[in-house]
Amino acid sequence: ASSGTALTPDQIRLINRLTKNITVLFDGDAAGMRASLRGIDLILEAGMNVRVCTFPDGDDPDSFARKTPIDELQHYLKDNATDFIRFKANLLMKDAGNDPIKKADVIRDIVVSISKVPDHIQREVYVQECASIMDISEDVLFSTLAQIGKKELQEANKKFVQDKKMEVVKATPEETKEKVNIIY
């Protein structure tokens, strides 16, 4: 359960050792859910299958689990857990309303999450689902996915070059001569 604290990559790695499937549990607080969306992307990056379940207003995962018999709790989770695309679409579209610019931002946000999925087949299925839910063509989503991938690659290359430059700056004069092949 995401209990107001950020989910860390180390925690995700530990969970990933035990299972590839994770259900993130939220209370009904929309602001708290929006703040925790980054955790969903981290889970996706780890190659895990993520579902999301929210609880009725006034209940958080702990209070709901304490007052609900285990079989009812399992039934509730089974019936109410949804994939991350449907969850994000429902949550973020509440704010977007009929504003086309905000709707485009919601779609872009979902596609960024899809871009975190390492498995190409899963990614394609998620694109199909997003297209269906958001009523947009798959071609546009795939094009946006490609743009995101290209941008991330450019950023990774830029960071690599910057890191190499910093190695030269931090190096001793002898190491610097070696790295840039200067002969005195």
Model-based region annotation:
Residues 1-4:
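Short hydrophobic/aromatic-enriched beta-strand-loop microsegments
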Residues 6-184:
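A charged alpha-helical hairpin associated with nucleic-acid processing machineries
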